[in-house]
């Protein structure tokens, strides 16, 4: 008989097959260009087509992707970036990497995503962006958040790392 403390709920399960192993082995044996080889361009093109975007840039992590986005927009000291109160640490770390300040906003109870109704009270003259995060494949009310960012001339940077494959009103997230 198992005790409750012996029960484990898996956070994820990795599925691979022989083709996956062969492709990875081929890349490793090539000995160079692991991160910039032709497979990366093929992957970026596939993602662009899948989500319906004009651009795709592969980085090593979601943290790096957020950090690069914040740098590209020129966020820095004294700027405020609204983030969900329930998020992965990358959202806050990337904000701090550019010396901006994270401003935590409430989440929706049904998606655990950023609650659009809580954003307005968090906006100040220092606010530069809103960063909703898709959690566990569920997207927040992104259309309402987009409207708020447009009305307040703020950047909308979607952290859709956990939402790849999800869609809202027929449009892929991210």
Which residues make up each language-model segment?
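Active-site "gating" loop of Rossmann-like NAD(P)-dependent oxidoreductase/epimerase domains
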Residues: 166-174
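Short beta-strand segments
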Residues: 10-13, 60, 131-133
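PLP-dependent aminotransferase-like
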Residues: 71-163, 167
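Phosphate-binding glycine-rich loop
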Residues: 32-80, 94-98, 104-106, 171
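Pocket-edge positions in alpha/beta enzyme catalytic cores
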Residues: 13-16, 32-35, 104, 111, ...
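Short alpha-helical
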Residues: 19, 42, 64, 89-90, ...
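N-terminal "arm"/small-domain region of PLP-dependent enzymes with the aminotransferase-like
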Residues: 1-33
């Amino acid at each position: 008989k198992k005790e409750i403390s012996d029960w484990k709920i898996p956070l994820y399960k990795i599925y691979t097959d022989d083709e996956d192993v062969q492709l990875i082995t081929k890349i490793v044996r090539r000995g160079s260009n692991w991160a910039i080889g032709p497979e990366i361009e093929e992957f970026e093109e596939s993602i662009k087509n899948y989500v319906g975007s004009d651009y795709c840039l592969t980085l090593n992590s979601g943290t790096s992707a957020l950090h690069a986005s914040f740098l590209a927009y020129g966020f820095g000291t004294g700027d405020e970036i609204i983030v969900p109160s329930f998020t992965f640490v990358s959202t806050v770390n990337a904000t701090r990497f550019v010396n901006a300040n994270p401003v935590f906003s409430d989440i929706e109870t049904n998606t655990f995503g950023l609650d659009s109704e809580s954003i307005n009270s968090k906006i100040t003259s220092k606010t530069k962006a809103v960063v909703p995060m898709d959690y566990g494949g569920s997207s927040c009310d992104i259309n309402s958040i987009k409207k708020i960012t447009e009305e307040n001339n703020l950047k909308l940077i979607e952290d859709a790392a956990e939402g790849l494959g999800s869609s809202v009103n027929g449009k892929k997230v991210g």
